[in-house]
A protein has these predicted regions:
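C-terminal transmembrane-helix exit sites in multi-pass transporters
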Residues: 55, 116-141, 265-285
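Helix-helix packing/entry segments at the starts of transmembrane helices
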Residues: 20, 47, 90, 94, ...
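Hydrophobic/aromatic residues within transmembrane alpha-helices
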Residues: 33, 44, 48, 100, ...
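C-terminal-most transmembrane helix of multi-pass membrane proteins
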Residues: 2-5, 49, 153, 225-227, ...
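Specific transmembrane alpha-helical segments of multi-pass solute transporters/efflux pumps
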Residues: 64-107, 149, 233-251
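Glycine-/small-residue-enriched transmembrane alpha-helix faces in small-molecule transporters
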Residues: 1-47, 158-185, 205, 307-308
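Hydrophobic transmembrane alpha-helices of multi-pass small-molecule transport proteins
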Residues: 56, 60, 132-153, 207, ...
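Hydrophobic alpha-helical transmembrane segments of multi-pass integral membrane proteins
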Residues: 10-15, 42-62, 84, 139-145, ...
Length: 308
């Protein structure tokens, strides 16, 4: 019995780590596709959301054959919340994250997005839901200092990061904070895979208004582009989320969140080694501060969260 429990726990740990690694690599692969293969970011977000949404809904039906994937549509209030979550949560966080990568790089975009828990702390304090603690103050200070060093390399006179990437990265973090807080009752009632699957598909349909998925020139695609697209759209999005959620069957939510901190580490390492993104000395200090902050925040009890 003990050996069986240990084996299941190990399975959960592996699933959580693999899911986080896929997320981190997915961002770096997206960076590669934008900069070296001229993939349009608008089309990519559309394809990523539509394909991943359909994939997750199919997975849900396979796992729950007796349940309807349309159950959320039977309650008008829940449907309204799903639509809000799909547009203000899923669509904004996915587009802003990819836009930050496109105008900067995957490492900085991922780090800026992962500051989201600090925005949640500030929001809860402003609303009076929680009192400001010493931990919260230290987290805010570490965020400001780490972000300042990452973006300026310690200089008060200039940015070493594209301002557009900074804007989109901060927006991605704010959207992720909303994405984390808002859908709790949806998740409790219908489950993560169904809600995220529909949110991706609905936001993907909305993105088609900006850039239809069929408006793409594939004549210059080679096998490498196709393989990277499959990884970025399926592996780095749908499979990453599925593995992460599946790990919750075997380990606690706190442990899963802790192992999820591998994501920004992988993004930074992959960007440095594969795409040769160079970081200056004080930027490296800022990266270390933000990673320590992410680790500490993962150990602190947070609202039930989803990921990008």
């Amino acid at each position: 019995m003990a050996n069986n429990h240990s084996a299941l726990r190990l399975k959960g740990i592996i699933l959580a780590i693999v899911g986080a690694c896929l997320w981190g690599l997915g961002g770096t692969v997206s960076d590669f596709l934008f900069k070296y293969k001229n993939i349009n970011v608008d089309w990519y977000v559309t394809a990523r959301l539509v394909v991943s949404g359909v994939f997750l809904l199919i997975m849900y039906k396979m796992m729950q054959p007796k349940r309807s994937i349309f159950s959320v549509f039977q309650d008008r209030r829940m449907l309204g919340k799903l639509l809000i979550f799909s547009i203000l949560g899923m669509l904004v966080v996915q587009y802003a994250y990819m836009a930050s990568i496109n105008t900067g790089n995957a490492a900085i975009a991922t780090l800026l997005q992962y500051i989201a828990p600090v925005y949640i702390i500030i929001w809860f304090v402003i609303r009076g839901v929680a009192k400001l603690t010493l931990f919260d103050v230290l987290a805010i200070i570490m965020t400001l200092l780490g972000t300042f060093l990452l973006l300026t390399n310690g200089s008060f006179s200039n940015l070493v990061v594209n301002p557009a990437s900074l804007f989109w990265g901060i927006l991605a973090g704010v959207a992720l904070a909303f994405y984390t807080i808002y859908p709790s009752d949806l998740l409790n009632r219908f489950g993560s895979i169904l809600i995220v699957g529909w949110a991706m598909l609905i936001s993907g349909v909305a993105m088609n208004l900006r850039h239809p998925i069929w408006h793409i020139d594939i004549t210059k695609w080679d096998i490498s582009i196709i393989l990277f697209l499959i990884f970025g759209i399926i592996g780095g999005t749908a499979l990453a989320f599925y593995f992460f959620i599946d790990s919750l069957q075997y380990i606690s939510a706190k442990e899963t969140t802790l192992f999820g901190t591998v994501d920004p580490v992988v993004a930074v390492i992959a960007s440095s080694l594969w795409l040769h993104v160079a970081f200056k000395p004080f930027q490296i200090v800022g990266i270390i501060l933000i990673m320590i902050l992410i680790l500490l925040l993962s150990l602190k009890r947070q609202p039930e969260a989803l990921d990008e």
